[in-house]
C-alpha cells in the first residue's frame, strides 16, 4: 500500500512538474502597484494567486500578462482587443474594433465594487457590468461624476496587439504604453486558485477568470 501511494505521489509530482515547466505557471497579483491593481479590478484583485496558461496563442478577448514594451521589467495586464491592422477606438468605457462596438450583456452578480484611485488613494464606488467579449467578462464602469480617460483612435501595427484594462475608470493599458509586440504576450490568465483571504475564503477560491 505504501509503495502504491509512493508511486502515485511520484507520478502526480512529475505531471505537475512538467506542466509547471511548459504549460502553466502561478503568479500572485502584487499589492504594492496601485496603478496595476486598479486597472485589473474587478476581474482580479491584489493578493490573488492566479494561473497563467502558456501553450496556446492568446486570442481576441483574452486577459493576458505581458512585459511593458519600453520597461520590460514591469508587468502589464490587459484585455487583448486588437491585432495587427485592426482599427481601434476607445471612447471612455466603450471599445470599437473595425467599426464594431463591444456591447454590455448585463450587470455583474456583485453589481458594484470599490476601488482606490491610484493617485489620490480615495476609495471610489464603481458599477460592474458584463461586457460581451470572449463569452463575457467583468468591466468596471466610469461613474458619471468622474473624469473619463482620454479617447484614442488608431490602427494597430502589424505584429502587435492592443490591450485595454477591464477597469475603464483607472486604465493602465495601450493608451499609456502603446501597442505591445505579440511575441511578448504569451501568458493567458484563466484561473484564480485563492484570493487575498486565503484558502478558506470560498468566495474567491477556485474560480475561472474569463
Label each PLM-derived region with a short phrase:
Residues 2-8, 13, 17, 23-210:
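Soluble "head" domains of membrane/secretory-pathway proteins
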